[in-house]
């Protein structure tokens, strides 16, 4: 399928799911009406039954209670199903919109933006209409963080590249499963701040870890209360004995109430988030995979005969049971009879003892799967993109029909480009608006994706993994009293230091030393590039300064010239955005100023 056919598939799926959602909504309405009549009809019939006999009334109450509870469960089941179908409809509609260039449904990752980062700010990695927003389909904070880290620190070892590519390819082929996973996570988005108190509790010392007496009392006192109640009902013991034991249990609870409340405050109402974790783990556990990397993740989730989903589900049930204390009357009765708070905490601490080391691992695995799904979705939506290959002839970067993912394919101009071996510097000259900066970002974005294990916008690409470093959009800083020019010098110093340290740096620079006069800028740029070439630096630099082009003859085989040319025909100017060999011969600043009437 091509992108247009994929878009049509998304739209038809969205329509189908909306129809299914409406059908489910009608069924839910019918169930709601039945619940209403069951409740009030049961009350009326029970009242009539009691006029005949107590037994008839009790039987009718029990029958209608069972029917009402069954309808309630039936309602909850179909309500969740309707919500799931609604999520699937939204997913397909959002993907269709994304293929039309509308990315507003997806988080842009603004919180990850960092102007001091090696490259993310320069290449629009995060923010509105960024690469992150283009890729991001995560439904958990953990997945969002992992995807952001893969993109902002993408250097990958050779041995890890192919396994990751295989995992992404496999997930691309599982479009229905990907949507099921995403829809499962959309019900209650898994947020780190909601889970943090749960993780903190798991690291705390157990309340009863060193008290055998407490454990004995917690098991024996409820038994004593139950036995005394039975004996009181049968007339063997007077009721005051039971009341005395009941109140004694409440006093015992009161003695540890502060600790109990602290634990409950940390864990209360976390069930819905655990339910979300359970659904995501279950979706992954129940799917079969071929790629070794995904199977390694699966082993971390459900290895050693442990079901992560089942274990999390058990924790959720324990927390639900603990939350019954929120109803003061029920909590009072349960604590007086069964020491319910202590019983709940003991069961929770048993779970903590068994799984506290695994739970953070499960969360991390959920995040990895979430991030992989985003990249799998990217592959599915772009069938013409290719997976890059690690270079076997030592070329740092070479590509055919290289383009930028975020430019509409109808307007995208692609280029063939080869940098050469390590130690090569490419000087790209050209007029204003000729396409230099866009090309630099095109190289950077595809290099990032290549090292992430994802496909690139090209028909063919070879590369050597390295550490990307850019200086393209330097910002001044009022808060740190740092001027624009000083900020740029600081980045150039960092680049030089990285190269000298032996890091495999791949640099991309755009018009350096912009904050000084032309002669000073030209001299400074030349001296800086001479130093970079001397140190064996590898990368690209775009410039308007054609005098830098002479470095090619001074360093044959090490420095190469490329350019973007323009055509000026009378009052018209034409940009073809195609990279060429050599140094640009045409500039357009005065022409553009005249066109805009600035010089009139």
Identify the function of each model-found stretch.
Residues 375-600:
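ATPase nucleotide-binding head domains, primarily ABC-like/P-loop NTPase cores
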């Amino acid at each position: 399928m091509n992108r247009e056919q994929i878009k049509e598939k998304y739209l038809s799926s969205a329509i189908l799911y909306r129809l299914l959602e409406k059908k489910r909504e009608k069924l839910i309405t019918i169930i709601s009406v039945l619940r209403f009549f069951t409740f009030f009809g049961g009350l009326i019939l029970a009242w009539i039954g009691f006029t005949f006999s107590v037994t008839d009334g009790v039987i009718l109450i029990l029958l209608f209670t069972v029917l009402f509870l069954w309808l309630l469960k039936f309602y909850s089941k179909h309500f969740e199903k309707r919500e799931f179908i609604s999520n699937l409809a939204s997913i397909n509609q959002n993907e269709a919109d994304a293929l039309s260039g509308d990315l507003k449904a997806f988080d842009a990752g603004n919180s990850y933006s960092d102007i001091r980062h090696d490259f993310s700010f320069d290449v629009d990695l995060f923010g509105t209409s960024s690469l992150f927003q283009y890729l991001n389909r995560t439904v958990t904070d953990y997945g969002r963080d992992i995807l952001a880290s893969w993109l902002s620190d993408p250097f990958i070892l050779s041995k890890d590249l192919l396994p990751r590519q295989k995992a992404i390819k496999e997930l691309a082929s599982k479009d229905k499963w990907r949507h099921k996973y995403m829809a499962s996570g959309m019900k209650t988005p898994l947020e780190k701040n909601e889970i943090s108190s749960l993780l903190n509790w798991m690291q705390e010392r157990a309340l009863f870890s060193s008290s055998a007496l407490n454990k004995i009392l917690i098991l024996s006192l409820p038994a004593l209360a139950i036995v005394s109640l039975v004996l009181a009902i049968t007339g063997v013991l007077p009721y005051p004995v039971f009341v005395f034991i009941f109140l004694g249990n409440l006093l015992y609870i009161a003695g540890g109430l502060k600790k109990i409340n602290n634990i409950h405050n940390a864990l209360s109402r976390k069930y819905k988030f655990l339910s979300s974790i359970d659904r995501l783990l279950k979706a992954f556990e129940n799917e079969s995979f071929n790629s070794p990397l995904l199977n390694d993740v699966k082993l971390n989730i459900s290895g050693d005969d442990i079901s992560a989903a089942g274990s999390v589900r058990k924790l959720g049930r324990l927390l639900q049971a603990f939350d019954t204390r929120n109803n003061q009357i029920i909590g009072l009765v349960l604590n007086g009879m069964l020491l319910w708070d202590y019983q709940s905490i003991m069961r929770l601490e048993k779970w903590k003892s068994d799984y506290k080391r695994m739970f953070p691992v499960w969360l991390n695995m959920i995040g990895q799967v979430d991030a992989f799904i985003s990249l799998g979705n990217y592959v599915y939506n772009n069938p013409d993109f290719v997976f890059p290959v690690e270079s076997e002839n030592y070329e740092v970067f070479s590509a055919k029909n290289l383009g930028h993912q975020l430019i509409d394919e109808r307007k995208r101009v692609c280029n063939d480009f080869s940098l050469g071996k390590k130690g090569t510097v490419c000087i790209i000259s050209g007029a204003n608006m000729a396409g230099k900066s866009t090309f630099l970002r095109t190289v950077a974005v595809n290099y990032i994706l290549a090292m992430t294990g994802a496909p690139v916008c090209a028909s063919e690409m070879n590369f050597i993994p390295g550490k990307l470093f850019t200086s393209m959009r330097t910002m001044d800083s009022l808060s740190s009293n740092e001027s624009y020019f000083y900020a740029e010098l600081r980045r150039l110093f960092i680049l030089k230091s990285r190269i000298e340290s032996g890091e495999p740096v791949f640099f991309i620079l755009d018009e350096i030393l912009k904050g000084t006069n032309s002669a000073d800028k030209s001299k400074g740029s030349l001296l800086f590039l001479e130093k970079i070439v001397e140190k064996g630096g590898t990368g690209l630099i775009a410039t308007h300064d054609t005098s830098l082009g002479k470095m090619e003859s001074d360093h044959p085989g090490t420095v190469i010239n490329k350019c973007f040319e323009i055509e000026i025909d009378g009052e018209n100017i034409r940009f073809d955005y195609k990279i060429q060999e050599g140094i640009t011969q045409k500039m357009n600043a005065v022409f553009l100023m005249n066109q805009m009437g600035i010089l009139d």
